[in-house]
């Protein structure tokens, strides 16, 4: 075991019967096959998510609700659907772009959804047809996150920025030049003050 992580649910479901404590947390186990096994830990990426502080092993995240919650005919598709924020943190911490993520209990497809957004490859296994269909529909709608954002997260730091005015001062960009965004949809003409 490399770590155990406590997911403290900010908004846990109450125990309406009053027969036990409210399930307000879940324990995640991060393990490797052996002490000599290689594993990924993106320390800087987690610092980037945590105001440049080392990530702790107790995470305060809400349960899945609102528009993220999959519903069919007004009812939850899956009773224990995990929030994307939880899987985002897990996959960002323990994998890299183009890695393969396996979820042997696909459920509503949260792990695969986040893997696709983060540029990871994924396999999901699910025996319940209703869950599988819901996950499949969900995954069709997912768009990967922009590479610039992923690079910043993966490297833990933003690329150095150069003041635009210095590009003109150094003659790299000439006044009167028209520049475009990478999709050629937005343009701007360089003017001198």
Regions found by a protein language model. Give the residues of each.
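PRPP-dependent phosphoribosyltransferase catalytic core
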Residues: 133-193
